[in-house]
């Protein structure tokens, strides 16, 4: 993600700032960091986390020395992949729901979009994210908290607007957004490895109903169907 405006500084930009070559070639350093993350994502799609550093630098087209100028090792790169994946997802959700006029309709859409992978039976991606999330959280708790912040911030914007409009009554919008993020993460992680669950088909609506009630929403709001990860039409907003 770009660092322009109010957007957070990306991992690639932070990695470039840490590089000893930053003053001479910051743009090149950012490009290399970005290429390593993109290469890691391609390798993860092929074989999960079971790729070597040598495979990574070959896929990224960078020297091994360049790799170690940006990260201390593979775990830091996987952390960067996790951060970028979450940030990209949050940006995609926001863009896809932009035409929904009601903040609760957008929030509802985000719940459906966040749980879409496990709901659609895509096991490889969710299982990688789940297993690596908790492993990396033990190694880098502060960094992983930072990685999930784009989703919490996305929820907070909609909760705050909904509260301003009198649609919900959360006692603490920031805490509500954080707890909502954690609930969706826990649900996502559960269904990534669950074999059979008769409630899987309704999990999105179950989570949304619970969150809306916790926020102080109304029965009318509960009737809005959860969004999918596609560009919604303006007619679906309220």
List each model region and its residues.
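Amphipathic, non-transmembrane alpha-helical scaffold segments
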Residues: 29, 33, 78, 82, ...
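N-terminal intrinsically disordered/low-complexity leader segments
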Residues: 1-31, 219-238
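Helix-turn-helix
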Residues: 31, 35, 39, 43-76, ...
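Short amphipathic alpha-helical elements of helix-turn-helix/winged-helix folds
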Residues: 39-43, 117, 183
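Short secondary-structure transition hinges
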Residues: 115-157, 164-168
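Short, charged helix-capping/linker segments at alpha-helix termini
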Residues: 26, 45-51, 167-171
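Hydrophobic/aromatic-rich alpha-helical bundle segments in the mid-to-C-terminal region
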Residues: 126-130, 141, 145, 163-209, ...
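Hydrophobic alpha-helical connector segments
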Residues: 80, 94-121, 177-180, 227-232
């Amino acid at each position: 993600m770009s660092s322009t405006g109010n957007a957070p500084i990306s991992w690639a930009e932070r990695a470039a700032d840490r590089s000893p070559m930053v003053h001479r070639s910051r743009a090149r350093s950012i490009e290399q960091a970005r290429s390593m993350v993109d290469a890691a994502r391609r390798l993860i799609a092929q074989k999960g986390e079971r790729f070597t550093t040598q495979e990574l630098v070959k896929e990224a087209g960078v020297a091994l020395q360049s790799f170690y100028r940006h990260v201390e090792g593979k775990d830091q790169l996987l952390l960067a992949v996790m951060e970028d994946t979450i940030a990209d997802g949050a940006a995609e959700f926001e863009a896809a729901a932009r035409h929904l006029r009601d903040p609760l309709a957008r929030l509802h859409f985000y719940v459906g979009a966040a749980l879409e992978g496990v709901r659609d039976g895509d096991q490889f991606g969710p299982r990688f994210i789940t297993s690596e999330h908790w492993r990396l959280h033990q190694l880098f708790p502060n960094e992983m908290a930072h990685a999930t912040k784009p989703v919490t911030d996305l929820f907070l914007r909609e909760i705050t607007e909904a509260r301003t409009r009198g649609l919900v009554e959360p006692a603490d919008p920031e805490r509500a957004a954080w707890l909502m993020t954690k609930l969706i993460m826990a649900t996502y992680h559960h269904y990534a490895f669950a074999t059979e669950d008769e409630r899987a088909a309704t999990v999105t609506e179950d989570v949304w109903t619970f969150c809306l009630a916790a926020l102080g929403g109304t029965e009318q709001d509960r009737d809005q169907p959860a969004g999918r990860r596609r560009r919604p039409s303006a007619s679906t907003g309220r």
